[in-house]
Amino acid sequence: TESLEKLLCDFLSLNENDWVLWTAQPNDWNDDCDKFNGCFFVVKNMPRYPQHANCRCTLKKINQPVPYVTANADCDIRKFSEYIFADTHNNGKKSLFENWGYAKKDSELLSQLFVSQALQKYCAGDYQLKGTNDFCAKIEIIIDLPVKNGSIRSIKSGWKLYPYGK
């Protein structure tokens, strides 16, 4: 319990805008700790800590991530070319993007725009933790998309959070 008290004391000394590296202790429990292992979180948007009564995860204060240096993002162009603009997916996204002035030929531009904004916003702590899947933590980032009439549309986008800023 002494080490747990130290962990909680260290945690309580953090400010909401501090960044931490989450380190999970290997275990056989069916918990989310492993999915956060090695991930960077801003304190105000990090998972509940401790995760459970037997949690031995540690938080280490780190410097704020720097885009393209200590943090990276990836958005496969196929998210647009083969999903959003595909005729086989009738989910309304294609017509929405087309109404905003985008077409399949803009897939690379959209991918770059999403990556750039997601990375900048993640590193600024401007994201929301949305839970986990079977393998990793999930976050939501609002992408501000310029549209053909000159206005901006804000779109919720989902991202997987991987260890060490990926």
What is the predicted function of each stretch?
Residues 11-14, 18-26, 32, 113-166:
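Functional cores of ribonucleases/endoribonucleases
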